[in-house]
């Protein structure tokens, strides 16, 4: 077999494997993304969030759409999907490229961001107002999003699951008070003494 032919065969095999590798990479990437919102899935979010938590300035925030079932029942699932997609986009924009946002399931989202300036409280207050704006694709939908957050530095011994539990307790308290934003306390969470709410699970 001539040398030019061998070269052509080698190039062809390399191209086939290159295309196959690209295709597999795209398949894996899509499997890690939530199909509705484009955010990371729970598993993909967990891996990235754990890396960010090595930074003592990390902040964990949990977001939950208020009255989501009522939105679905009143306006239909298309409006509910539009609300979730818009909420996800607004969260991702607020967190930026240096953080990570994921959809944990249903109408619940989580994010980890780095807050070196100590402005998380102000940022989340603004974010809550942004999340309460009407949805362009479904302007008849009006609701709010409750946020609970916790600083990594306040609980250095906690892993991601523990921090999510604290953020969840704060978020549940936010649903019952004004402003729709609560920071997890430094001690035992009064709003959630028994841990996460029934049916809620922390990241593995």
Predicted regions and their residues:
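Signal-transducing coiled-coil linker helices
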Residues: 1-35, 42-53, 57
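Conserved nucleotide-binding and Mg2+-coordinating catalytic segments in signaling enzymes
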Residues: 29-47, 63-76, 85
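Heptad-repeat coiled-coil signal-transmission/dimerization helices
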Residues: 45, 49, 84, 88-91, ...
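A short glycine-centered flexible hinge/capping loop motif at secondary-structure junctions
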Residues: 72-80, 105-106
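GGDEF/GGEEF active-site signature
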Residues: 88-152
């Amino acid at each position: 077999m001539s040398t030019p032919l061998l070269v052509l065969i080698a190039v062809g095999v390399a191209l086939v494997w290159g295309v196959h590798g690209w295709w597999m990479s795209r398949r894996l990437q899509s499997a890690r993304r939530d199909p509705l919102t484009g955010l990371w899935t729970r598993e993909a979010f967990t891996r990235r969030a754990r890396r960010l938590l090595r930074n003592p300035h990390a902040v964990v925030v949990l977001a939950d759409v208020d009255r989501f079932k009522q939105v679905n029942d009143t306006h239909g699932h298309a409006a509910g999907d539009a609300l979730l997609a818009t909420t996800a986009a607004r969260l991702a924009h607020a967190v930026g490229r240096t953080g990570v946002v994921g959809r944990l399931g249903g109408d619940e989202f989580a994010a980890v961001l780095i807050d070196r300036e100590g402005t998380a409280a102000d940022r989340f207050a603004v974010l809550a107002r942004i999340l309460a704006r009407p949805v362009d694709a479904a302007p008849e939908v009006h609701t709010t999003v409750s946020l609970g957050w916790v600083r990594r530095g306040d609980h250095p011994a906690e892993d991601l699951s523990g921090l999510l539990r604290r953020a969840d307790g704060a978020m549940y308290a936010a649903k019952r008070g004004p402003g729709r934003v609560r920071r997890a306390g430094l001690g035992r969470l009064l709003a959630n003494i028994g841990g996460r709410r029934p049916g809620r699970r922390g990241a593995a």
